[in-house]
Amino acid sequence: MAIAMIPKTMSTQHPDNAKMPAWASEKSMIRNDDEVEEAYQCYTIGIKEVMWDAEGKDVDTHVLRKLISKNHEFFEKNVLGSDIFLTYRVPNPAIEGTERKVLTETLESIPVNYDVFNTVYKRDIPPIFEVILPFTTSSKDLLNIAKYYEKAVAARDEIELYDNVMVKNILGETKPKKINIIPLIEDKDSMFNIDGIVKNFARAVSAKKMRVFIARSDPAMNYGMIPAVLMSKYAASRLCKMNDDIENYPIVGVGSSTFRGRFSPENIEKSLYEYSNYYTFTLQSAFKYDYPQDSVKNSINIINRHERSFDYLEDYEEEIIKNAVNKYVINYQKIIEKLAPAINNITMYLPKRRSRKLHIGLFGYSRSTGNVTLPRAISFVGAMYSMGLPPEIIGISSLLNMKDDELDIIEKTYINLRSDIMESSSYLNYEVFDALKDVYKIDQETINMIKADVKYIENNYGIKSDLGYERERHNYLSSLMNLAFKNHDFENTRKYILDMALIRKFIG
């Protein structure tokens, strides 16, 4: 179906917040029903779209009914599907096992929500008409969902039950007849093939406009921060080039930590400049809850006024980026595979901010390296920072192996590279090298590779020595956390991890 007004701000349920919102029913965790209140609160502070995670367990497909019961008058003035939006993130049946039929439940709820909304507000507007499909790797992934909805949900109206009695005579007409599918592209190969995915799907469904979602967090965990930024720039460039044929509105999935995008109220102008080719930006939990509300609201207004640029890379520059990414990934993944057991152990003691199980990531499917399973990106980042080893550092000495033209393109394309490296490396605790060996039993070869990364930063960017009280305290707490973990003092392990997260203003 046609795309309505395109929102520029998208709230997500990513549990990266260190602080808890005042409206939460519990001190440490957002419960299922709290998420309905969360969605309502997001709309009231100017966020135009809420992504509702229908991928995990305990999904609530009655969210719209609960939402409008919060404040009937608000949703009379702010029309869902026209002024503000609710967008499902659905399971990808090509990857999911036991949860794949949650897709059916979620898609079936779309016409139900239409009926509820139309009954209450007397408007012929579908309040939900788009879904996000994670792990999209081909146009067929998208076509499967689009056609399933059209033929298994909407087209059953015309099924004759008996003697000219149709399904629509019993259940009423199904609306909307079609839905828009937003591909969420998360892996390297698919990002480098974004043209084929988008063009082939648009051709198959005769779409003139599309929203395309580019992941930023999982690519960073799977390939490294610098490759993740470069891949997001590559994807945005390709989308800019095809805009004359298929009008597109890219979404970038950014978080507050530098590793996951450094998209926070205190860095909003730099972030919008870095990702200027994107139209819509995700506002994750740390963005919303770890900063003063005036700052959050002001940042939301800035994003809502942001104009997308259409600058793009030359074809030869895109090829250089692909080569640079492939070079960088080699050392990065070698190190991460060795650190995986330590990371997985520490994540057990991170604060849990959501009660229901949300979506899982590429490493959870072991689709990226094939050798290790890692937690979600938020937990991954939280574990690394808690050890005193910012993940932004890992693999950066690979730049020594780059050709001059590759380095030039990296520095030109990743605008805030120096700023981001200096920010994240200020959380490096040099005592982590002893902890890696003594506490986490990491082999010396891997430790030496990490030391080479640190040396590269020292030589090329510098690491702040005058850190200030909070950064010094963070370093001290990371040493205490490693000591507590070594001695199986898991109560204090949890305490130190939370204290550090509060300093950073994000868990991971």
From Swiss-Prot:
InterPro entries: PEP_COase_arc-type (IPR007566), Pyrv/PenolPyrv_kinase-like_dom (IPR015813). The keyword Nucleotide-binding does not apply. GO terms for biological process: carbon fixation; oxaloacetate metabolic process; tricarboxylic acid cycle. It is an enzyme of class 4 (lyase). Its EC number is 4.1.1.31. It catalyses: oxaloacetate + phosphate = phosphoenolpyruvate + hydrogencarbonate. Keywords: Carbon dioxide fixation, Lyase, Magnesium. One of its GO terms (molecular function) is magnesium ion binding. It holds the Pfam family PEPcase_2. Belongs to the PEPCase type 2 family. HAMAP family: PEPcase_type2. Homotetramer. This is Phosphoenolpyruvate carboxylase. It comes from Picrophilus torridus (strain ATCC 700027 / DSM 9790 / JCM 10055 / NBRC 100828 / KAW 2/3). The lineage of its organism: Archaea, Methanobacteriati, Thermoplasmatota, Thermoplasmata, Thermoplasmatales.
